[in-house]
Design a protein with these regions (language model features):
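Short S/T/G/P-rich N-terminal loop/turn motif that feeds into the first structured element of a domain
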Residues: 1-54, 61-67, 71, 94-104, ...
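C-terminal structural segments of small proteins and small subunits
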Residues: 67-71, 76-91
Length: 114
């Protein structure tokens, strides 16, 4: 089964007090819902309309569990604590992987996706 992912990218600096209140609730809410923090950083190179603020990536067992984590009472309480203290872009998506087979013919290398 494909994994589910929660991606949060801040579009503007957060209000420090509201951000702290949010963080105290959001992390435990995501862990309680089965999330595993893969990355969290403010060291971001943004391209094509991206913004270089805090970015967080959390992995879940499935797309459905990632959506359930966002909609959980615990995470909604964290959002209430944030109370508009940050402009964020939230994405929940299903991770679909593909395999790459390299084919070498003479001196040429080809990549075949399947």
């Amino acid at each position: 089964m494909p994994k589910g992912y929660f991606l949060s990218a801040h579009r503007s600096p957060a209000n420090p007090e509201k951000r702290q209140a949010y963080l105290e609730l959001a992390g435990p809410a995501m862990i309680k819902a089965g999330g595993q923090m893969l990355a969290s950083t403010s060291s971001v190179d943004a391209y094509e309309n991206g913004v270089t603020e805090q970015t967080v990536l959390i992995e879940f067992e499935s797309f459905e569990k990632a959506k359930a984590a966002y909609n959980s009472e615990d995470y909604q309480a964290a959002l209430k604590a944030l109370d508009g203290g940050a402009d964020r872009d939230i994405r929940i998506f299903e991770g679909k992987w593909f395999y790459i087979k390299w084919v070498i013919i003479s001196d040429l290398t080809f990549c075949h996706r399947f």
